[in-house]
């Protein structure tokens, strides 16, 4: 297992990459997943980071954890810009990191689920200016906070 680190619009990202691509017979690439921990946009829950990422790595994914902005730094679509940039970077470096560029998923818990769902529907928002390169191919929403009004989470 190889570890890579990079920044996505200043958000630290760590990736867990399989380094056995030379031994793969059929495909030399793997699907990728970006994990977004929850924490009410106040913090990032440790139990929704490495344990989840390592489980997906065990299932054969190239796995990435993004420490998106929280607290006062989370305004003005900043976490969304960071996650969008992360997906774009995975596509740009797909060959180098042996990623299937058409199989990039984003998974999020709670506030991270909100962020994940937001990218799923707002990937083409003019403020992102990244086009389809930041569109995830799949979303995994784990108890996301996405309901407002009368039925909102309290």
Residue ranges and their predicted role:
Residues 1-28, 80, 150, 154:
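N-terminal cap/lid segment of alpha/beta-hydrolase-fold proteins
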Residues 4, 34, 64, 140-142:
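Hydrophobic/aromatic beta-strand patches that form the interior of the parallel beta-sheet core
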Residues 17, 29, 44-48:
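N-terminal carbohydrate-binding/catalytic regions of secreted carbohydrate-active enzymes
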Residues 29-38:
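Short beta-strand element of the alpha/beta-hydrolase
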Residues 39, 62, 67-71, 145:
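Short beta-to-alpha linker loops that shape the active-site pocket of alpha/beta-hydrolase fold enzymes
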Residues 45-46, 66-101:
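Catalytic nucleophile-loop/oxyanion-hole region of alpha/beta-hydrolase
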Residues 46-64:
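Short amphipathic alpha-helix adjacent to the substrate-entry channel of hydrolases
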Residues 85-154:
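Primarily recognizes the serine-hydrolase "nucleophile elbow" in alpha/beta-hydrolase
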